[in-house]
A protein has these predicted regions:
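Conserved ATP-binding subdomain of kinase catalytic cores across diverse folds
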Residues: 21-178
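Juxta-kinase regulatory segment immediately upstream of eukaryotic protein kinase catalytic domains
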Residues: 1-23, 75
């Protein structure tokens, strides 16, 4: 996507400043992701993540965003009550100017604050990195303790239902055997 098109899209979000730099993030395989640096009125630079959400995987962005907002609000409130720092605990979503993520050219775009000093790993053989990933997943689960899951939308039906996933794997293997 061209830089001027991305800037036009980015200007649909509630950010005080002007986009000055755009970099494509090549990690990930579902969504198209860009890092955008803004120059603020205070002449500082602040970085954000602009993401085109793949509608084949996530057809209903408003429901997905509602889930994200509910979960991050819950986790931040819980951490604040414990006196913990919330700066790096969750992502911070940026609202669109009209509070409708589907309104940007009838496509699914979202933006969040960039978390400095982070790194993405698509694969690793490092036991240390795997251990840290496990700790992060465990901490996420612990921070969700008590969250009313029934308030969430089911974004991908039966995605976390293990018997369904096993059946999908068996079907894929069977299909692969039949095509060989």
């Amino acid at each position: 996507m061209k830089k001027d098109e991305l800037i036009k899209i980015a200007k649909n979000f509630s950010i005080d400043g002007e986009p000055i730099k755009i970099e494509k993030c090549n990690s990930g395989h579902i969504n198209k992701t860009y890092a955008i640096t803004y120059k603020t009125k205070e002449d500082e630079q602040k970085k954000y993540i602009l993401q085109y959400v793949n509608t084949n995987v996530f057809p209903n962005l408003p429901e997905l965003m509602t889930n994200i907002k509910k979960i991050t609000k819950y986790m931040n409130q819980k951490a604040t009550e414990k006196g913990e720092n919330t700066d790096r605990l969750t992502i911070t979503m940026i609202d669109t100017l009209d509070d409708n993520p589907n309104s940007i050219y009838n496509e699914n775009w979202r933006m969040e604050e960039f978390i400095d000093n982070t790194k993405t790993y698509l694969t690793t053989e490092s036991m240390e990195i795997l251990e840290e990933a496990g700790k992060a997943a465990g901490k996420f689960q612990k921070n969700l303790d008590g969250f009313p899951a029934e308030e969430l939308y089911e974004i991908i039906p039966k995605f976390h239902y293990t018997p369904n996933r096993v059946n999908q794997l068996r079907e894929a293997l069977s299909s692969e055997e039949n095509n060989s």
